[in-house]
Regions:
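Histidine-centered metal-chelating micro-motifs
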Residues: 64, 68-74, 93
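Conserved small/polar residues in nucleotide/adenosyl-binding loops
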Residues: 166-168
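All-alpha amphipathic helical-bundle segments outside canonical DNA-binding/catalytic cores
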Residues: 120, 137-151
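A hydrophobic/aromatic-rich effector-binding and dimerization subdomain
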Residues: 2-11, 75-138
């Protein structure tokens, strides 16, 4: 039996926010398949979610990597929750070689899309997401496609390097 899920993409090449709350996460109460590539870090609280039909509990400093094709569903928050994230449209993700940037970390990402980070490493990614948020949400600044692609490649390469140091 084939299961069809609503397809979800981003309205722009890159979108980053530093204060994603339950109000926004409720959009994903119904299971959907991402066309975009989204990377997030939990900054506050905890929540239950389903990623590729497996249940996860997400806590502060957890890194969540959602590659194109991932099926996601926000189940519930167990306390006030907040995330920061950077998302890249299917069009942007399609222009780069995801496998080249992820490399041998691909099986780890599929097996474990939620990875706890130490405070220091999490802070680096939060700062990078904050920079992308300021740029992507600024009406007076348009991020060039090449800059957007490099940003996605930087994040994916960082994740590959982080995962190479973590034994999952």
């Amino acid at each position: 039996m084939k299961m069809d899920f609503p397809q979800v993409d981003l309205p722009t090449e890159v979108l980053a926010w530093t204060n994603v709350t339950e109000d926004i996460l409720n959009i994903y109460k119904q299971s959907c398949r991402l066309q975009a590539c989204i990377v997030a870090i939990c900054t506050e609280g905890s929540m239950k979610t389903s990623i590729n039909l497996l249940d996860y509990e997400i806590h502060p400093n957890d890194l969540i990597t959602l590659l194109p094709g991932t099926i996601i569903q926000f189940r519930e928050r167990t306390e006030k929750v907040c995330l920061c994230f950077a998302g890249f449209s299917a069009h942007c993700a399609g222009r780069i070689n995801l496998m080249k940037n992820i490399g041998n970390a691909y099986p780890k990402l599929i097996e474990q899309p939620v990875v706890p980070l130490n405070e220091e490493v999490a802070s680096y990614l939060k700062d990078y997401f904050a920079l992308l948020s300021r740029a992507s949400c600024n009406e007076n600044f348009e991020m060039d496609s090449e800059l957007v692609e490099l940003s996605l490649q930087t994040i994916l390469t960082s994740i590959r390097l982080i995962l190479s140091l973590i034994h999952i």
